[in-house]
């Protein structure tokens, strides 16, 4: 609800994390754009050293106390935005520093951590603590901690898009039509929701003209004489 409130004000959601958590968060920002047809600026990720470091093992960057805040300032962060931090240990300097800067600037924050009573949880306005316990390989938080963060992240971003009206029923009616698979899925969703339209090729032309299932339905509603 807190994130939704910020987005309604025209704000953005920023994910901030290092290692596994940061990479999973960045993946989510990419996936939600296509699945829900949103602009890439609505949900963004902040990663140590910048997004260009995602595929490189420069984990020392997570000790930088100012890099994350500087990245946010470059994006003109404001009180209308929301920052969600990720840290398995709950102590990552990069994330903790960002949350502290946000608090000073009056920017609301949340976090997902995997240890109880962690400094990052104490610094966030809306902490989520998922206590996963020791990893099978000690310290390798890409396992249980990373998996739990991915599930919580999915819950947050999915419920947020549902509440914004980007999903109807359980269908991606706003998905971007960027390949044959998604175009075909959009056609099948449209025909399932509108069984009176049975000509697949004509539906496909309509979908491509409109840009999404939802826009196609709106187009039909406004122009009932369309040949479909």
Label every PLM stretch briefly:
Residues 13-151, 157-164:
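Glycine-rich phosphate-binding loops that contact phosphosugars or nucleotide phosphates
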Residues 154, 158-194, 200:
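Internal, active-site/partner-interface "lid" segment
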Residues 1-10, 76-78:
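Glycine-rich phosphate/diphosphate-binding loops that line cofactor/substrate pockets in enzymes
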Residues 33, 121, 161, 191-195, ...:
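Residue-level preference for well-ordered alpha-helical positions
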Residues 194-228:
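NTP-binding/hydrolysis catalytic cores, primarily Walker-type P-loop NTPases
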């Amino acid at each position: 609800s807190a994130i939704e409130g910020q987005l309604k004000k025209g704000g953005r959601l920023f994910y901030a994390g290092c290692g596994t958590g940061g990479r999973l968060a960045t993946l989510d920002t990419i996936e939600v754009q296509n699945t829900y047809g949103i602009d890439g600026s609505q949900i963004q990720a902040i990663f140590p050293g910048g997004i260009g470091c995602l595929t490189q093992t420069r984990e020392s960057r997570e000790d930088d106390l100012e890099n994350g805040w500087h990245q946010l300032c470059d994006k003109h962060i404001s009180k209308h935005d929301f920052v969600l931090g990720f840290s398995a240990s709950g102590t990552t300097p990069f994330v903790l520093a960002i949350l502290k800067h946000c608090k000073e600037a009056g920017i609301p924050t949340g976090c997902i951590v995997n240890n109880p009573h962690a400094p990052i949880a104490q610094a966030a306005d809306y902490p989520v603590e998922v206590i996963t316990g020791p990893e099978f390989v000690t310290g390798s938080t890409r396992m249980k901690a990373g998996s739990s963060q991915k599930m919580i992240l999915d819950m947050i971003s999915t419920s947020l898009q549902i509440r914004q009206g980007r999903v109807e029923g359980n269908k991606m009616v706003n998905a971007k039509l960027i390949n044959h698979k998604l175009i075909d899925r959009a056609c099948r969703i449209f025909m399932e929701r509108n069984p009176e339209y049975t000509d697949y090729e004509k539906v496909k032309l309509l979908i491509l003209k409109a840009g999404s299932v939802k826009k196609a339905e709106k187009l039909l509603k406004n122009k009932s004489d369309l040949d479909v």
